[in-house]
């Protein structure tokens, strides 16, 4: 669905003809995909904000874990980046950027109707079509540089209906992991 400029070319009692002049904006991705990402340094975080917006996430949740070095987010700069990326990718609405959350609080308050997809460096499981259902709300969780601690991993893997999956045989930088994970989830979702 998109917004368009229209010109009415004919009005009669039983019909109206319109001419499409130009498409204005593409409606956002119909999937509700959230990105829960552990905070990283400024430049990679800006890339994460930009690329996740371009790839259609509806919400970005900055996470602080035991091994997260950065503890806060410049919200003014973050909003500017997602607004620019929204315009560049011809979408209508920028993603919501939530307040920074501790990992344990994020896991505790995760909506029961949202499926948690854990991009896990230790997983050998490939995300498949039967792991995601059309219309299902999804939250992709990506860890910090140095990965989650063993206790955090255990907490994540005990979330009901969590799906742990691999995104690469290599260890990826956070910004590369975000692009890869969102692209993979979008691909699987739209082909399910």
Ranges and model annotations:
Residues 1-3:
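Short, small-residue-biased leader/transition segments that mark boundaries at the very start
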Residues 21, 39, 100, 119-122, ...:
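Fold-independent oxyanion-binding glycine-rich loops
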Residues 150-192:
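Structured adenosyl-cofactor binding patch, chiefly the S-adenosyl-L-methionine
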Residues 13-20:
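A generic structural motif
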Residues 110-154, 161-166:
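Active-site/ligand-binding-proximal alpha/beta "capping" segment
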